[in-house]
Amino acid sequence: MTDNSNIRVVVGMSGGVDSSVTALLLKEQGYDVIGVFMKNWDDTDEFGVCTATEDYKDVAAVADQIGIPYYSVNFEKEYWDRVFEYFLAEYRAGRTPNPDVMCNKEIKFKAFLDYAMTLGADYVATGHYAQVTRDENGIVHMLRGADNNKDQTYFLSQLSQEQLQKTLFPLGHLQKPEVRRIAEEAGLATAKKKDSTGICFIGEKNFKDFLGQYLPAQPGRMMTVDGRDMGEHAGLMYYTIGQRGGLGIGGQHGGDNKPWFVVGKDLSKNILYVGQGFYHDSLMSTSLTASEIHFTRDMPNEFKLECTAKFRYRQPDSKVKVYVKGNQARVVFDDLQRAITPGQAVVFYNEQECLGGGMIDQAYRDDKICQYI
């Protein structure tokens, strides 16, 4: 058995079951393990209750159970500057941001990694469902997690080779039920704790109310693509491309009783475009452009790639051709794609390997910009 006792791994512990089992497995494998809780947001509610305090208590309980030291580090300023400001700027621009991608890139694998190095870390580890493997040249490849339902490579697609070189994902080969079972068999304090969902800084709060605290809503007209007025929208930032609920128009405008969907936004005129039918023509596109293109290892400045891609989390892969130039790319789909959403991540795969990705700027139908921003 390999002696890992001289290898220090600093584990990002959230107070959830996944990061708890991550720390446990590394400890069992003989590593020198330290647990660190990141406080990224002041989430004290109107009753003075802070969920981060409860989560930190869970981290402390688990760390004590498995016998590792633990610390808390405050990244509220870094999170505000690098993630939350981006989140607001994207909504101001009428886009739908993906703060999880930015949080991994800027906080969990940058601010946290830097902090871990001050603790003498050889590696950091998190409870993400992804895998890393090293080839004979020492290049690290990131592979999908074995649990298809939980694979999180979509959110990790902006990680660099330097970040991946320093990262372990001990849960990558496990299915989620196995992780729960390991926690229960070890009697961990978090074994039965439910998974957190949604955006960390919103938590259980109403999204509309939350966003309205930071950005003034600007109501405007809701129109069909052919110019029919369908009433008022509450503010473009509250709607995303392909959204069905929350439009308040139902079937009262005649037609064929098909459900209504958001099919586009005109930011300059503050118009929300809606259309009937899941596969409404305005929702379908043949290609997209993306920026902030990034690969997990060094690539030429300009090249063409045939691979598969995801345009949202948990979506089946689609075959694409990618034309890369610097940090920009044009992605052409083999088949029509629905509801390509500016602001979301496009992520590239070669079978099991996550190659990298970028942020969607615009969708196209042939060479015509779709009815979006």
UniProtKB/Swiss-Prot annotation:
The lineage of its organism: Bacteria, Bacillati, Bacillota, Bacilli, Lactobacillales. One of its GO terms (cellular component) is cytoplasm. It catalyses: S-sulfanyl-L-cysteinyl-[protein] + uridine(34) in tRNA + AH2 + ATP = 2-thiouridine(34) in tRNA + L-cysteinyl-[protein] + A + AMP + diphosphate + H(+). Disulfide bonds join C103-C200. Catalyzes the 2-thiolation of uridine at the wobble position (U34) of tRNA, leading to the formation of s(2)U34. It comes from the Bacteria. Keywords: ATP-binding, Cytoplasm, Disulfide bond, Nucleotide-binding, RNA-binding, Transferase, tRNA processing, tRNA-binding. It comes from Streptococcus agalactiae serotype Ia (strain ATCC 27591 / A909 / CDC SS700). The record marks H128, Q344 as: Interaction with tRNA. Belongs to the MnmA/TRMU family. InterPro entries: MnmA-like, MnmA-like_C, MnmA-like_central, MnmA-like_central_sf, Rossmann-like_a/b/a_fold. Residues 98-100 are annotated as: Interaction with target base in tRNA. GO terms for molecular function: ATP binding; tRNA binding; tRNA-uridine 2-sulfurtransferase activity. ATP binds at G12, M13, S14, G15, G16, V17, D18, S19, M38, G127. It is found in: Cytoplasm. This is tRNA-specific 2-thiouridylase MnmA.
